[in-house]
Amino acid sequence: QDLPGTDNSTATLCLGHHAVPNGTIVKTITDDQIEVTNATELVQSSSTGKICNNPHKILDGIDCTLIDALLGDPHCDVFQDETWDLFVERSNAFSNCYPYDVPDYASLRSLVASSGTLEFITEGFTWTGVTQNGGSNACKRGPANGFFSRLNWLTKSGSTYPVLNVTMPNNDNSDKLYIWGVHHPSTNQEQTNLYVQASGRVTVSTKRSQQTMIPNAGSRPWVRGLSSRISIYWTIVKPGDILVINSNGNLIAPRGYFKMRTGKSSIMRSDAPIGTCSSECITPNGSIPNDKPFQNVNKITYGACPKYVKQNTLKLATGMRNVPEKQTRGLFGAIAGFIENGWEGMIDGWYGFRHQNSEGTGQAADLKSTQAAIDLINGKVNRVIEKTNEKFHQIEKEFSEVEGRIQDLEKYVEDTKIDLWSYNADVLVALENQHTIDLTDSEMNKLFEKTRRQLRENAEDMGNGCFKIYHKCDNACIESIRNGTYDHDIYRDEALNNRFQIKGVELKSGYKDWILWISFAISCFLLCVVLLGFIMWACQRGNIRCNICI
């Protein structure tokens, strides 16, 4: 189908942008649902299902907790002197030694996890007048009774348990972590059988701190055949400080110290398998890519991870506003420029031209405006990632039962942070999408105005994104318009002449239409006058009688 008003002496040039049959809905500041040609998902909503062992060093706890590995539970001896970036605790981990409790379990666990090492240095403590290396059938090491390898259970020697007073200075340049404990017998009889005194006492001091613990004899729930317990405590000795241990019974003594390191190591509870792969970000669900700025896989993360948000999806527009082409038009059909809809047939650029002239029809992309839009949009995802990625990890928070109110407050703070970031993410993406759509619309308008300035009075803006060119414009002429080398002065006289001729025809055609309408109106008027005159004449002659009743 030819373009209206197109013959060999004129041409039609339309400007437009590409479109797709099915676009993607995104959100902007002004519109919750606007269709664009292309968009990128910004929320990572799934994991790989496994924890990648690269680039972070992962230590699989298997069936040991970190504290059991620290104390030296016999079934955790494989972890002696190990190091890690992330220690993974499993849900099936269990203790298999003397029953114990750690009054400040969460703090000790976090402290050791962040240190990233179980490197242990044995020291020569001198324990005079007592029996060392106590063991229990609840803590088998092979067929023999055993105990925690990093602790030394001291009991009476013969019938005496003297007062112990031992010192150990820290002459190193790093902090030392000492683990020690207090034994709580199940009965008073057990107390005197092991330590002679009816009540023991343990005091551990440094220049900065002092801890004094009194054992509590009494029966407790049976665990691995025992109703007695050990309470585990810890002390950090700074460089130049000194450790002092004083006791008259019930002491579970240290055998040495753990080296303390500073770093960003951590611990995570997860049952995801460890696989051979590479990922910077780890969650309890498994590793996730960090090529997106947001994720809703898990709140707990380790490494350089996307920010956790509540949304399942946030789409960033990376294409222009999509206005699908009306399929009934054909290539040109009834003229269609960018004002009406996009062009689905244009695949080699975002913006372009369609023309019809004496040589036929054609289409070409405008690469300059296309590249300008692409350059401005490229890097949007990376810029959003830079604004939102956490270069640190979100650790698990643990609190004892007596710290329930602190735990509630911590949960409230974390939930508030998530709500805030979810809102920020929504606004950030909406702003970026608005900017993208405005930007791509602007490039289309720039191209249209550039073409208008070239053609000047040689063409007429048809109001729909097309120009009617009033001179013969072959393919070379069309190409000059596209590449900006068109000289309107060359065609000015021809265009002016053709414009008057075409407008004159349109004017005569317009007068004819007016005459027809006026003739029709006069004929109707005369018919009404004749009919009215006949009725009045008939009434006067008596042929028609008209009665009016009130």
Swiss-Prot record:
<keyword id="KW-1032">Host cell membrane</keyword>
<dbReference type="InterPro" id="IPR008980">
    <property type="entry name" value="Capsid_hemagglutn"/>
</dbReference>
<dbReference type="InterPro" id="IPR000149">
    <property type="entry name" value="Hemagglutn_influenz_A"/>
</dbReference>
<keyword id="KW-0348">Hemagglutinin</keyword>
<feature type="site" description="Cleavage; by host">
    <location>
        <begin position="329"/>
        <end position="330"/>
    </location>
</feature>
<comment type="similarity">
    <text>Belongs to the influenza viruses hemagglutinin family.</text>
</comment>
<keyword id="KW-1015">Disulfide bond</keyword>
<feature type="glycosylation site" description="N-linked (GlcNAc...) asparagine; by host">
    <location>
        <position position="8"/>
    </location>
</feature>
<keyword id="KW-1160">Virus entry into host cell</keyword>
<feature type="disulfide bond">
    <location>
        <begin position="52"/>
        <end position="277"/>
    </location>
</feature>
<dbReference type="GO" id="GO:0046789">
    <property type="term" value="F:host cell surface receptor binding"/>
</dbReference>
<feature type="lipid moiety-binding region" description="S-palmitoyl cysteine; by host">
    <location>
        <position position="546"/>
    </location>
</feature>
<feature type="glycosylation site" description="N-linked (GlcNAc...) asparagine; by host">
    <location>
        <position position="165"/>
    </location>
</feature>
<dbReference type="GO" id="GO:0055036">
    <property type="term" value="C:virion membrane"/>
</dbReference>
<keyword id="KW-1161">Viral attachment to host cell</keyword>
<keyword id="KW-0261">Viral envelope protein</keyword>
<keyword id="KW-0325">Glycoprotein</keyword>
<dbReference type="GO" id="GO:0019062">
    <property type="term" value="P:virion attachment to host cell"/>
</dbReference>
<keyword id="KW-0946">Virion</keyword>
<keyword id="KW-1043">Host membrane</keyword>
<feature type="disulfide bond">
    <location>
        <begin position="281"/>
        <end position="305"/>
    </location>
</feature>
<keyword id="KW-0945">Host-virus interaction</keyword>
<keyword id="KW-1133">Transmembrane helix</keyword>
<feature type="transmembrane region" description="Helical">
    <location>
        <begin position="515"/>
        <end position="535"/>
    </location>
</feature>
<dbReference type="InterPro" id="IPR013828">
    <property type="entry name" value="Hemagglutn_HA1_a/b_dom_sf"/>
</dbReference>
<dbReference type="GO" id="GO:0020002">
    <property type="term" value="C:host cell plasma membrane"/>
</dbReference>
<feature type="disulfide bond">
    <location>
        <begin position="473"/>
        <end position="477"/>
    </location>
</feature>
<dbReference type="GO" id="GO:0039654">
    <property type="term" value="P:fusion of virus membrane with host endosome membrane"/>
</dbReference>
<feature type="disulfide bond">
    <location>
        <begin position="64"/>
        <end position="76"/>
    </location>
</feature>
<feature type="disulfide bond">
    <location>
        <begin position="97"/>
        <end position="139"/>
    </location>
</feature>
<keyword id="KW-0564">Palmitate</keyword>
<dbReference type="InterPro" id="IPR001364">
    <property type="entry name" value="Hemagglutn_influenz_A/B"/>
</dbReference>
<feature type="glycosylation site" description="N-linked (GlcNAc...) asparagine; by host">
    <location>
        <position position="22"/>
    </location>
</feature>
<keyword id="KW-0472">Membrane</keyword>
<comment type="function">
    <text>Binds to sialic acid-containing receptors on the cell surface, bringing about the attachment of the virus particle to the cell. This attachment induces virion internalization either through clathrin-dependent endocytosis or through clathrin- and caveolin-independent pathway. Plays a major role in the determination of host range restriction and virulence. Class I viral fusion protein. Responsible for penetration of the virus into the cell cytoplasm by mediating the fusion of the membrane of the endocytosed virus particle with the endosomal membrane.</text>
</comment>
<feature type="glycosylation site" description="N-linked (GlcNAc...) asparagine; by host">
    <location>
        <position position="38"/>
    </location>
</feature>
<dbReference type="Pfam" id="PF00509">
    <property type="entry name" value="Hemagglutinin"/>
</dbReference>
<keyword id="KW-1167">Clathrin- and caveolin-independent endocytosis of virus by host</keyword>
<comment type="subunit">
    <text>Homotrimer of disulfide-linked HA1-HA2.</text>
</comment>
<feature type="lipid moiety-binding region" description="S-palmitoyl cysteine; by host">
    <location>
        <position position="539"/>
    </location>
</feature>
<keyword id="KW-0449">Lipoprotein</keyword>
<dbReference type="GO" id="GO:0075512">
    <property type="term" value="P:clathrin-dependent endocytosis of virus by host cell"/>
</dbReference>
